[in-house]
C-alpha cells in the first residue's frame, strides 16, 4: 500500500486527494462572498465536510451491514468527526507517528486509510491491511506508513507513542507522535506513566483525549478527579505539558488548538494534551444500547451538538454551501461508501491454513545464523559477567541497540551489576535508567522497536514483572501476528528469577510457565555462563521478542562458570544440550534444578553404577522435543525436574508431550519433581522445605530407576 499524506482529503478511493492548505486567516478569502472563513477557501471547506461525511456515512453503513448479518461488530465515531479531521489535517503519516484508538475513524481516513480498506477489516478479509482479518474492525494499522497495528486493550498505545517519540529524539528526527483515547482510558495507570515520561523528557507527543463523557456506561464523574470531570485539569501538575480543553464538535476551534499544540511540541518545550469535549451519538459499540443508561433528554442535547450539523450550518450561513449542493454531496458520499463496501465484501477470505503463520519471524534470519561455531575456550567466567560481556559486544555491534531499566546505568550498573560499565562506554543516550514502572519499560520498548530500534530492557526481579504483562502479552508478543507480519516488536526482556537466595515471597519467583502460555514469545533459561552469553547474543540479533530468564542463584556460582566464548558465539533457540549421557533414565531440567540433577546423577553413578542422562533444555520456548523424545526412547524412563511450582509448572507440558509421543517406549510412570504449591518463605528452613532440594532430586531419580 502506498503512503498517504495526512494533509490530503479523499474525494473517492479512485481519485487523487485534494490538498487542504490552511492560511491561518491571512489573505485567503472566499470567492463567493469575500469573507475570511477561518483562513479556508470554499474548496478546502467542502473537502473537510466530505471527510466528515465519509466517516459518518461509513459508520452508518457498517451498522446496517451488521443488522443484515454480514458483519459481527462495529464501533462508531459519530459525534467525534470534527476534531478528528482537524487533527488529520496536521499530522503526516509519512513522518509523524500515529496511535489512533478504535473510535478515531476520521483521523484514520485522513491518514490515508480508504473506506474500502476499513470495510476489508469489517468483513475480516485476507486483504485487510490492518490485520488480514485477525483483529476486530477499526483496529487501525497501515504498512509503509507510521501507523502501527493498534489493539483492543485501552491505554497500551500511550507508552508506545512515548517510545516512538523517544526513538525520534535519539535519532534526531523532528516529528510528532500522536496518540488518542477516550476519557475512560485515562483511568489506566499506563496513561499517567506515559504523560509522566513524556513530560519528564519533553518528548514530542500529542495526547488527544476525546471526551464523550461515557466509558461504555460509566459517566465521566465516576472516572476522573479533574475539575468538572476534566482530564486536562487532572494533569495540571505536569509543568512541561501544554494543556487545552476544547470544544471538539467545533472544527475551527479544534483545528486552531491542535495547531497551537503542535507548534508547542515542535518548539521542544514538551508534550501536549488536548481534551476534546465531543458527543457520542451512537452507543458505545454494536453490542451496546445506550438508551438503557442515558435519558432521552440527554441524547437529544447531544444531537444538538452534532459536529457535522454545526459545520454545515456554518457553511450555509456563509454562503459556501447550498441545500442542493449538500444533498448532492451526501448522495455522492453514500454511493462511494456503498461501492467501497461492495468491493470489500467480494474480496477473498483468509485461508485457514495460514492461521499459525507470522507468530514469529519467517524471514529465515534465525536459520541463517552461524550457531556454536566453536567451543568456548577463553578464561573461566561467571554467568553475570558473561551476560555483561554479551551486552557490551552486541551494543558495539549494533548502533540501534538500546538498554534501559531500573538502576541499570553507572555507577550502580544494575542491582546484580549485569549492566556495569555500559552507560560509561556507550553513553546515557543509549544506556539509561527508567522510571520505577515496569509497564513503562515494556511499553516504551515496544514503541522504540516499532521505530526500528532494538531495545534490550531489564526487569529487576521477575516478581515485579507483572505490571508489564499487558504490554508483553497483548502488544510485544502479539504485534507480528495481529498485523499479519506488517509490524513487529523484537524486544529482549532480561529478568532475574528464582529462589534459593532467601529472598522471600517477592524476590524468589519463577515466571517461565506463565509466560510460556503467551504465543509469539521466545523464552530462554540458561544454566551456565557460556549458554547465557550465546543465547543472549542470539536474542539481540533475531527479529523476535525474547524473555530472557537469569537465575539469581547462578549469577556467581562456581559450578555455573564456563570458559568464555568469543564474540561470535551464538546458541540457537530450541536446541537442548545433553550435559550427561546415560541409559537408565532421562532427567529433563533447566536452571538451578538442572545442576542439582546433574550432581545427583553423578552421585548415583558413583554409588550404584546407575546411568542417568541429564538434558538441559536451555530454552522453554521453543522446546527441543526431538532431543527429549530421542533420549526417552533410549532410556525408557523420564523425570522432569524444575524449581517452579508443581501445579501449572512447565514440567507438566513437557510430561504431556512425552506421554503423547513416547508412551509405548515407557517402562515406568512419567515423574515430575518441583516446588510445593505455596509461596516461597523468607526463613531458610521454610524455603528449603518448599523448593526441591538436591537430596529430594537424588531420591526421585533413584526411585524411578528402581521402579
For the regions a language model picked out, list residue spans one by one.
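Cofactor-binding active-site loop characterized by glycine-rich and histidine/acidic residues
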Residues: 57, 64-203, 208, 219-238, ...
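Glycine/charged-rich beta-loop-alpha catalytic/anionic-binding loops adjacent to active sites
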Residues: 65-70, 137-151, 174-178, 239-243, ...
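Active-site nucleophile and cofactor-binding loops and adjacent substrate-binding regions
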Residues: 66, 73-80, 102-103, 140-158, ...
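Conserved acidic/glycine
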Residues: 1-83, 89-90, 276, 282, ...
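Glycine-rich ThDP/TPP pyrophosphate-binding loop and its adjacent helix/strand module
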Residues: 146-338, 346, 516-636, 640-641
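A glycine-rich helix N-cap at a beta->alpha junction
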Residues: 124-128, 199-209, 430-433, 476-495
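Short acidic, glycine/serine/threonine-rich loops at helix termini
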Residues: 87, 109-114, 189-193, 217-222, ...
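Alpha-helix C-terminal capping segments
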Residues: 85-94, 162-173, 195-201, 236-238, ...
